[in-house]
Design a protein with these regions (language model features):
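N-terminal nicking endonuclease/strand-transfer module with a His-rich metal-binding environment
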Residues: 1-268
């Protein structure tokens, strides 16, 4: 079953290059091929200035070094991809999403990971990180690129930063709209490949489903066999039933009330 999940994160100065190396699995790549164990399915980047067009890490290192201390060096979309799709179909979906959301505006880097989920099946997802300084065709060295924008003389200042000054409510609305655009695109690709699954980015409450959303586990928690078993039990405890009027509802048998409860197998 395709999973509906899209989260948005913001990276501060000093975090961009390490995160780019993490999603690109640089440490695994440095190991001998026969010893490397990586869940990296595909990675790529685009819209980089000339001084980073052959190595995106140069861009993120410059962002960490020259972006103002209280500024953001990147935004990241972490998105679950349909496990029903094969690797080629997933890449096509991601590239279409990047074309529609990023286009030629922002420098970006992405990586598709495909680790094993708790049920032993694939858990494909993409990390898409991008910098919101607009590409305007003006050549700037790394230091100038991240300076404040000069509206009167753009060539003298840094690249203009997009989407600044938005309120919390505006950002919240933007994310809701983004999730809907992703759902529409993802479902169109599922239909294109004649796959039955569809995703719905609405909350359980908005869908009329009586179910509490799961809390996201930390990587260390997800690897803990006791937590994995308890969470699997929790998931199977939800029995989906269809009511007489055709609407979907859920019968809740028990739910984990906290991570401590999950860890110790105690349910409400």
């Amino acid at each position: 079953m395709a999973i509906a999940r899209l989260s948005v994160k913001v990276g501060k100065a000093g975090k961009a290059a390490p995160h780019a190396e993490y999603i690109d699995r640089d440490e695994e790549k440095k190991k001998k091929e026969e010893q490397a164990k990586t869940d990296l399915e595909h990675s790529d980047y685009g819209n980089m200035p000339k001084w980073a067009e052959h190595n995106p890490i140069n861009f993120w290192q410059a962002a960490d070094l020259y972006e103002r201390k209280n500024g953001s060096t990147y935004r990241e979309y972490e998105i679950a991809l349909p496990r029903e799709m094969n690797a080629e179909q997933r890449l096509e979906l991601v590239e279409d999403f990047i074309q529609s959301e990023i286009g030629s505006k922002y420098p970006y880097q992405f990586a598709i990971h495909n680790p094993k989920a708790m049920d032993g099946k694939d858990q494909p997802h993409v990390h898409l990180m991008f910098n919101e300084r607009l590409q305007d065709g003006i050549e700037r060295d790394p230091e100038q690129y991240f300076k404040r924008y000069n509206g009167k003389n753009p060539e003298r200042g840094g690249a203009k930063k997009d989407n600044t000054g938005k309120s919390y409510q505006e950002r919240k609305t933007d994310i809701k709209d983004l999730r809907q655009r992703w759902a529409d695109l993802c479902n169109s690709h599922l239909e294109k490949h004649q796959l039955d699954s569809r995703i719905d980015m609405r909350s359980y409450k908005e869908q009329g489903i009586d179910k509490e959303p799961e809390k996201k586990l930390l990587p260390s928690q997800a690897k803990d066999p006791e937590i994995r078993e308890a969470l699997q039990q929790s998931r199977t405890a939800y029995k989906g039933v269809v009511s007489g009027n055709g609407k979907y509802s859920t019968l809740r048998i028990f739910t984990p009330t906290s991570f401590n409860d999950i860890q110790h197998g105690i349910f409400a």
